Amino acid sequence: MTKKTSLKGKKAALLRLGSYLFRHKLYVITAFALMLASNLLALLGPSLSAKAINAINLGVGKVDMDTVTKNVILMVIVYAASALMSFLLAALLVKLGQKITYTLRKEVFDHLLTLPAGYFDTHQTGDIVSHISYDIDTVNASLSHDLLQICASVVTVAGSLGYMLSISPVLIGVFAVTVPISILFTRYKTKRTRPLFKRRSAKLGELNGYAEEMLSGQRTIRIYGREADVCNRFDDRNAQSCDAYYEADYHGAIIGPGVNFINNLSVSLVTLIGGIFFMLSLTGTLPPASIMFLNLGDLSAFVQYSRKFAGPINEFANILADLQSALAAADRIFGILDTAPETEDSENAVTLTNVKGDVEIQNVTFGYDEEKSVIKDMTVSVPAGSVTAIVGPTGAGKTTLINLLMRFYDVNEGSIAVDGRDIRDYTRDSLRKAYTMVLQETWLFGGTIAENIAYGKDDATREQIEHAAKQAHIDGFINTLPDGYDTVITDNGVSISKGQKQLITIARAFLADAPMLILDEATSNVDSRTEKNIQSAMRSLMEGRTCFVIAHRLSTIKEADNILVMRDGRITEQGTHDSLMEQGGFYASLYNSQFDTAE
């Protein structure tokens, strides 16, 4: 059962890969025609060579120079034409390969943007990047070359077999002795190599994921002096990746030499037996009418055709090794493409417009794993234009609540409503555009500062961009830069301080001008002067908007209209700062501990 399933999986993967190839039918048809012409022309060479050699008439002392000259000239023409066809085919395959790579990368990347947030929570960024780069390159190398090469091998093998049969049926029997051995050896080795190539791809993805994770946190690594530990962990993963590469490539590489050795034995046997036939024919022991009669030209042609026959079989073994690698990479690529995207908006979904900002959370229960709830029976009413702060220890469910508000995940039980309507009745796009977010982990892309500020509003004018920067108190810093707003940010903005990056994202939020706002620990880990600028910008940004604020620095949320204290997924306390301090509960103790620490 497992074997049948495996075979079906291979066939399905090959057919699916082939569908990408045949999207470019004109290229494929042209490539096939060039391949066919090149191989058929090359097959004429040994036959012409045989005629030229036979025209020498060994043992008679006469040479038919006209026949020799004619066939030599034809050989030059045939081989030159075959080489030209091969050159054109190679150029065409490069172009075809690029088209396939473009299509695959576009499909994978576009699909990634439709996947639910949970996919990115459970997959390393470096591993995903490995799919888009290495795996697609591996598939392309096999798809644009190996499949056509298999067709070329079939033509060469069939043509060579036909010529060999016409020359000496007896030698065909001699040659065929080793063919089953070659086929069985190839089949045995390829069966063992595919799991090794899958492991190789997986280990490379793990290595890339770890490298990406560590490089993005290299400052933290240095602060805590963890360089040696990180290097050791990288060495372990690197060694595992190299071991996986060695095992896969070693077992894949020995297929070709093994098959080549078997084929060389076959050719040696043919040459030996054929030589005996030729000597017996030359001395007259074998009459021309004998099925074993053989002259020198025919023996030469037979050996050449046996080489041509064996060559594709040897190449086929190497191609199979490449296909094992390609199928392993394809499994990973199709794993992305087959991952279900976010659930589609309902057919009756409406666009959220004219947003007031009333939010009602009713009896909401949610867990990333349905058996373990992160938020439990939460009920909260958030009036339009109010500021709701969310505090609590790590793992209390604060960030999860934000994920639910934005519909990165849907609730397991209960409902969340905006302006009196369940958010599942709105289109996701319109719901998310109703919010703007300022996160602790700021994200700046490779582009100018102006482009980063305008990220949430494509049609923003320079005047609007500069006004947003002034509102965020970042305009002065930007103008100190040599290129001002046209300064290019690289490497995710590493040349800009954390506070300045947060101010740029606040400017982005000002420009987006959404009616609802989410601030996720936006003032953590910045100096006091920058924090004052951020707090001033925040107060302006929050005016007139429904705001949800997550912060560990409780001093920053004293002015919130309502503070939700979360512990273990439940709201344990709720009220204004003053009322919560009067209660003397968990919030008060948390606030006092931070205040005492600050003292």
Outline where the language-model segments fall.
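ABC-type nucleotide-binding domain
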Residues: 345-346, 352-599
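Short, membrane-interfacial amphipathic segments enriched in basic
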Residues: 1-14, 118
